[in-house]
Amino acid sequence: MNYPHPLIAREGWPFLAGAFVISLLVHASAGFWWALPLWIITVFVLQFFRDPPRPIPSAPNAVLAPADGRIVVVEKTMDPYANREALKISVFMNVFNVHSNRVSVDGAVEKVEYFPGKFVNADLDKASTENERNAVVIRRAADGQVVTLVQVAGLVARRILCYTKAGENLSRGQRYGFIRFGSRVDVYLPLDARPRVTIGEKVSASSTILAELDVK
């Protein structure tokens, strides 16, 4: 499988290097038991920033999960970024999930918008409208249908990273962003999309099918 990114995300390299060096210095100067809590933190940082390749389903009208986590919302509501009624599916990431964000559909980026905001628990519904967030509006290459991906910062996560811009073409499963330390991604779909997940279900980025789009 071709996944052109290191298995440990680059976003975590400074944190991992710092944790490792401090643990090593304390281990050398004070011994293993004093350093043990620091080694545990180092292992946690290592697992948090893991970024493994994932198989990508071939179904042409599938909308793939943009993140690892748990489904917390499946509802019809307004998509304020594309100004339409939409089906909204939200994925909550806890600190033990992979936090690399991946594209749900093939298409061209129409708009990228960043919104400053609060940092309430990303598991709460109000996080979608009150928290710091970054929206990417994508128009599918195949049929022009619009899918909006919104990275939402959480109580601990206060750093949204997005690596795409308007006019770029994206592919399903492509890595496009990262959120540090607990967060969520909201996905807004056409109203006639058929959800394939339920609230409470665990999903994997670019492997789990969130919904199927109606063929146009």
From Swiss-Prot:
Assigned keywords, A-Z: Cell membrane, Decarboxylase, Lipid biosynthesis, Lipid metabolism, Lyase, Membrane, Phospholipid biosynthesis, Phospholipid metabolism, Pyruvate, Zymogen
Catalysis: reaction(s): a 1,2-diacyl-sn-glycero-3-phospho-L-serine + H(+) = a 1,2-diacyl-sn-glycero-3-phosphoethanolamine + CO2
Cell compartments where the protein resides: Cell membrane
Free-text cofactor note: Binds 1 pyruvoyl group covalently per subunit.
CC annotations in GO: plasma membrane
Broadest EC class assigned to this enzyme: lyase
Molecular function via GO: phosphatidylserine decarboxylase activity
Record-listed Pyruvic acid (Ser) modification sites: 183
A Gene Ontology BP annotation from the UniProt entry: phosphatidylethanolamine biosynthetic process
InterPro entries, per the entry: PS_Dcarbxylase (IPR003817), PSD-A (IPR033175)
Record's bilayer topology term: Peripheral membrane protein
PTM comment: Is synthesized initially as an inactive proenzyme. Formation of the active enzyme involves a self-maturation process in which the active site pyruvoyl group is generated from an internal serine residue via an autocatalytic post-translational modification. Two non-identical subunits are generated from the proenzyme in this reaction, and the pyruvate is formed at the N-terminus of the alpha chain, which is derived from the carboxyl end of the proenzyme.
Residue numbers annotated as active site: 183 (schiff-base intermediate with substrate)
Main location: membrane
EC number, as in UniProt: 4.1.1.65
Function: Catalyzes the formation of phosphatidylethanolamine (PtdEtn) from phosphatidylserine (PtdSer).
Family: Belongs to the phosphatidylserine decarboxylase family. PSD-A subfamily.
Subunit structure of this chain's protein: Heterodimer of a large membrane-associated beta subunit and a small pyruvoyl-containing alpha subunit.
HAMAP family: PS_decarb_PSD_A
Alphabetized NCBIfam families for the sequence: AS_decarb, PRK05305.1-2, PRK05305.1-5
Protein name: Phosphatidylserine decarboxylase proenzyme
UniProt organism field: Cupriavidus taiwanensis (strain DSM 17343 / BCRC 17206 / CCUG 44338 / CIP 107171 / LMG 19424 / R1) (Ralstonia taiwanensis (strain LMG 19424))
